Structures are given as structure tokens and as C-alpha cells.
């Protein structure tokens, strides 16, 4: 099994069909441009106490398309299964920038009930991405193990908790935030986090899990 993993990571045996990578790059570019356009028009802003439906749609829409494409479009599935796991894990290291949530809390831009779990969770995933990447480089078969799966599941849990707090607290306890709310997360530039970066990081975790499952089978 380790030999299979080495072959897959160092010399992928599922080369993506020609043009698939270009198509996916264009999709991400168009998605990012759409987020900027809608964000500039205030399309993601919700009334105080109302559910942030536009934000949730912006998060779940691309994620749903990703899953549908994986399970129904073979070239996309092959592209995902041939992606370099080292790059995928390395990109998660950027989540150490969750420190920014704590900075925004310090300046009373975001509430602590959201900023602390979101910030610390992202920082934990970003920092631990380094030893996970080191394990992959040292032993490619690590990708098919339980610890690799657990790390990705924890990364997904962190994002899920942050999104849940941001979405549910304004509905269930609209006065809990006080004067400082999560409203800035629905406006540029912070809106890029829930409707672009969060789904992108979730896609990376899912890609890693799909590959891990294949390697372990």
C-alpha cells in the first residue's frame, strides 16, 4: 500500500485530461470576480437578526458544484485524484492567518464569540499543516493513514464551527454580540473569507480525503 501511495504522490498515475486544469482555473477566477462584484454591491449583507442566507448560498453553492462535479464528471474527478497532496496540505498552512480574526477582535471590529474560535481554530490547522506536510514528504504512505484523515476532519470541523457561530448566533441570540457584530464579514474585503476562502479550504480538505480513501482501499 505504501508503494501505491509513493507512486501516486511522486508520479501520479491518474493524469488529468488536457484542458481540465485550465477549466478549473477559469472557474475559480470567475468565482472570485463574481464575489468581488456582488460584495461591492452589498449583496451579502443581511438585516440584523435575519439569517445570512446570501452568505450561506455563497459558501454552499461552490461547494455543492465541487461535489457534483467530482461524482458526475470523470475528468474533474481524475483531476482531483491526481492533485499533488503536498501542495494541497501546504496551502492549508495559510490558515495561520486566522490571527487576523484576533486582531480584528482587539480593534472591536469582530465579536470575541466569533473571533476566538475562528481565529484559534484556523491558526491550529495552519500551524499543524507543517508537520503534516513533513510527514508526507518523509513517508508518502502517511496520506493513507488515520492521522492524515483525522487532521483533515479537524480542519473541516474548525471551518464548520466558525460558519455555524457566524450564522446561528445572530438568529438565536441577536443581542449577544452587542454593538460589535459579524456584519463586517458580509462586506468587502472580509466577505472573501466566508464565500471564497472557506469553501476553497473545504475543497482542499475534501480532495485530500478523497485521495486518502483511494490510497487506503
Where are these regions (language model features)?
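Short, membrane-exposed interhelical loops at transmembrane-helix boundaries
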Residues: 172-192
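Membrane-proximal helix-loop-helix units in multi-pass membrane proteins
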Residues: 90-148
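N-terminal membrane topogenic signal
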Residues: 12-28
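Alpha-helical transmembrane segments of multi-pass membrane proteins
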Residues: 28-43
Amino acid at each position: 500500500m505504501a508503494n501505491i501511495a509513493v507512486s501516486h504522490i511522486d508520479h501520479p498515475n491518474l493524469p488529468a485530461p488536457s484542458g481540465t486544469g485550465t477549466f478549473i482555473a477559469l472557474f475559480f477566477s470567475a468565482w472570485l470576480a463574481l464575489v468581488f462584484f456582488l460584495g461591492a454591491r452589498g449583496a451579502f449583507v443581511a438585516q440584523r437578526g435575519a439569517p445570512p442566507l446570501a452568505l450561506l448560498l455563497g459558501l454552499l453553492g461552490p461547494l455543492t458544484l465541487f461535489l457534483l462535479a467530482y461524482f458526475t464528471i470523470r475528468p474533474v474527478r481524475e483531476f482531483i485524484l491526481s492533485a499533488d497532496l503536498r501542495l494541497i496540505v501546504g496551502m492549508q498552512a495559510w490558515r495561520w492567518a486566522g490571527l487576523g480574526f484576533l486582531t480584528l477582535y482587539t480593534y472591536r471590529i469582530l465579536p470575541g464569540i466569533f473571533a476566538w474560535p475562528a481565529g484559534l481554530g484556523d491558526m491550529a490547522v495552519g500551524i499543524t499543516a507543517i508537520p503534516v506536510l513533513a510527514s508526507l514528504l518523509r513517508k508518502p504512505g502517511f496520506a493513507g493513514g488515520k492521522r492524515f484523515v483525522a487532521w483533515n476532519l479537524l480542519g473541516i470541523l474548525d471551518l464548520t464551527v466558525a460558519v455555524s457561530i457566524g450564522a446561528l448566533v445572530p438568529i438565536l441570540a441577536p443581542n449577544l454580540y452587542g454593538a460589535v457584530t459579524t456584519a463586517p464579514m458580509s462586506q468587502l474585503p472580509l466577505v472573501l473569507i466566508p464565500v471564497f476562502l472557506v469553501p476553497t479550504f473545504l475543497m482542499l480538505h475534501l480532495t485530500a480525503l478523497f485521495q486518502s480513501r483511494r490510497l487506503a482501499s
